[in-house]
Amino acid sequence: ESVALEYSRYNYNAKNLYQADQFRASDHDPVIIGISASGTTGGTATLNLLNFNDFHGRIGKNLTVPFAATIEQLRAEHPDSSLLLAAGDSIGASLFNSSAQKDQPTIDVLNALGLKASAVGNHEFDQGYDDLTGRVIGTDGKRNAQWDYLGANVYKKGTGTPALQEYSIQNVNGVRVGVIGVVTQETSTLVSPGGIKGIEFGNPVEAVNRVARQLTDGDESNGEADVIVAEYHEGAASNEDDATAKPTIDEQKAASPVFKKIVDDTDPAVD
């Protein structure tokens, strides 16, 4: 797992740019999909989906440069069909270079890299919901983060009303890519309760499935997508005593009921 390509704050010195195992953030290969694109029938389109998670404000000469360079290298291989996405915790629990400036350096770097959409992670709520929406995301006409920050399972307390944008539609190479973002339901136990007193966190799989059905119901007025990507900010079980262990999907499902539900119950409409 590469620090730049498949970013994890637990791995700093790995050498491989790509490992085709269950721990990869995405496959980093162009995805060939059979769809009707640009008015044609029976056509295919190439999508190069680039994904990272848990960046945690790793701003530094030996971290930011290789991370950014790898993204640019992969994007250059498919300049018209690449889409940069993230699965949350881009900010929070950051290095001093970023945390001392309330993660503004990280936001600036990700803006420059052309991040298009990201799930919120639990650390996006470290400074509270108001800070996330008012400063990090910003308001209409004065955006800070230039990507769509998504939280389909984040609701105004006591209601089913979304507290954040639920999905983003990105047009890539003639394909409408619907990106749905959700965060762990345990977020309320991981951050200060005072900062999230007006919101609550629902079941992430149920939220993904609800939005996926909306994006495939044939009604253009509520959003439609040719391809759906779910960005889950959620973790599978890990064995910190054996970093070389490579458990199978079935072993991971047995070790983590949450991971099992994601794998087994996410709507098949999600690609």
Regions found by a protein language model. Give the residues of each.
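Conserved beta strand-loop-helix elements of the APE1-like EEP
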Residues: E1, I35-S38
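Acidic, metal/ion-coordinating pockets
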Residues: Y7-R9, N16-A25, G39-D271
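Intrinsic disorder/low-complexity detector
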Residues: N13-K15, V31
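Short, conserved phosphate/pyrophosphate- and ester-handling motifs at nucleotide-, phospho-/glycolipid
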Residues: H28
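Short beta-strand scaffold segments in enzyme catalytic cores
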Residues: V31-I33, S168
